[in-house]
Regions:
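N-terminal secretory signal peptides that target proteins for export/translocation
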Residues: 1-10
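Enrichment for repetitive, rod-forming helical segments
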Residues: 10, 14-17, 148, 465
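Bacterial N-terminal signal peptides
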Residues: 14-27
Length: 468
């Protein structure tokens, strides 16, 4: 089992690049050792989320309202937070986004174990939801191997005290594999874990022009490295969740969502089964399981202020105004690791800084927010999608992101993350680096550069990453 904290890994050095193509990445005995120091602790762990600096009083009100709703526990019927299901993955946003505090990523202790039987539900916990593993959503491929790309919710409301006579069955996810890594088992299923939302408003506020300008400016440095990358942008057609109006989408593992509002609307529907103005259709239309004929979530124009906006707008407001992660105080080791991060090529994709343009903070605002506009975002991402090869490929196409392509994951806050990569297969940041290499990956040369560093240099680079 993968455990949080120190765990030694042997890092091979001097490995010919051609070996990477065949996935021969197993650590070899007799070489220097670098070690993942584990999840970085901070005084803010478990504390209340911090908003962006410089918010106005009104913006702070919308942030706090969004935070409250982000933590609400949804129910099937009765009360004010109703509409859960009939198929769902969890019953509150914050259950999946709580490491190191609300708005973060998957926690060390999987909350879905308790959600399975909440309020009398009769769900079985799927094999890939381990008590000490990450929160995972499941996507089925079709029987002929062509992926459908859709999330298939792991739980149903059957048996709950607030579900009435609704009776539907869970999907069948067997045969089982490794419950912690999610590897092995049913080859027809791929997994995704939650992405952190800290600093998401700054990412949303980065204009397309800045992303494209950096792509052009870095083209020369990428020559000969195998690194390419392109925006997830599709020309033509009607605007949808993948933003095929030609603009650059940027949220999600494949940068499939353009805006935080779209990101929130899709998650509310897909993860909790709650219909809303952007996604009005139920996840399951079985008779007897339809509590409401209209979307559960909508704007309430009979109220005023923050109470007017729908839940998905409130979620978007919270994420938009949530401050970015705070890095640790630099040390000699992390400063040297930062320099190595650049020199071996990691920064070719994990761009340290991009700058925002004009941006509003809440759905009801009409003027740019000083807290979001023209700010430096130290996200460590170019917001492009890259070919990551056969080792990481999930076979899913979303927008212009193909079966083995993923968005460059922003690394701010990575030092406090427990699980890594799109499916949460490892809690060891060194293994996550090694898994960037494989047949067809743009990162092969960069991983090779890491592997030929001395053990001391490797350790400094790892320490730098854990300081973010």
């Amino acid at each position: 089992m993968c455990k949080i904290g120190a765990r030694k890994r042997r890092i091979l050095t001097g490995l010919p690049l051609s070996f990477l193509t065949f996935g021969l990445l197993a650590p070899l005995a007799g070489f220097g050792q670098a070690q993942d120091p584990g999840v970085r602790k901070a005084t803010t762990d478990g504390a209340a989320p911090v908003p962006l600096h410089g918010l106005t009083t009104d913006e702070q009100t919308f942030f706090q309202d969004g935070l409250t709703r982000f933590q609400n526990v949804e129910v099937v019927s009765g009360g004010t937070n109703n509409g859960l299901g009939p198929r769902f993955n969890s019953n509150q946003c914050s259950s999946c986004h709580q490491q190191p505090f609300v708005g973060g990523s998957s926690p060390a202790a999987n909350p879905l174990i308790a959600v399975a039987s909440a309020d009398g539900a009769t769900n079985q916990v799927p094999w890939f939801e381990a008590p000490n593993g990450p929160v995972r959503e499941a996507r089925f491929r079709t029987s002929n191997g062509v992926p459908d790309g859709g999330v298939h919710d792991i739980f149903v409301i059957t048996g709950r005290s607030d579900a009435g006579s609704c009776s539907i069955a869970q999907p069948v996810f067997t045969p089982a594999g490794n419950p912690v890594t999610g590897q092995g088992g049913n080859p027809n299923i791929i997994f995704r874990i939650p992405t952190p939302t800290m600093g998401a408003g700054l990412i949303e506020a980065i204009p397309d022009s800045a992303i494209l300008a950096h792509q052009r400016a870095s083209a020369g440095a990428k020559q000969g490295t195998g690194v390419g990358g392109h925006p997830n942008a599709i020309q033509g057609g009607n605007v949808n969740r993948s933003g095929n109006d030609g603009t650059i989408t940027r949220f999600g593992w494949k940068a499939q969502n353009k805006s935080l509002l779209m990101f929130a609307g899709e998650a509310y529907n897909v993860e909790m089964g709650i219909s809303n103005q952007l996604f009005p259709q139920e996840r399951d239309e079985t008779p007897g399981c339809q509590g409401y004929p209209t979307p559960n979530d909508y704007d309430n124009f009979s109220s005023s202020g923050a109470a007017v906006v729908s839940d998905i707008e409130a979620f978007a407001d919270f994420m938009r105004m949530l401050a970015p992660p705070v890095p640790a105080t630099p040390t000699a080791s992390t400063q040297h690791g930062n320099a190595l991060f650049v020199s071996i090529g990691c920064a070719l994709c994990h761009t340290p800084t991009l700058t925002t343009g004009n941006a509003i903070a809440s759905g009801s605002a009409t003027l740019p927010s000083a807290a979001l506009s023209h700010q430096q975002a130290n996200l460590f991402s170019d917001l492009l999608v890259h070919h990551m090869g056969s080792r990481l490929a999930d076979g899913i196409t979303q927008g212009a992101a193909g079966p083995d392509e993923f968005r460059t994951a922003p690394l701010w806050g990575v030092g406090q993350r427990v699980f890594f990569l799109h499916d949460g297969r490892t809690s060891d940041i060194i293994m996550a680096i090694l898994d960037h290499a494989g047949e067809g990956s743009e990162a092969n040369q960069i991983v090779h550069n890491f592997q030929v560093l001395s053990a001391a240099d490797q350790q400094d680079l790892i320490n730098f990453l854990r300081s973010l």
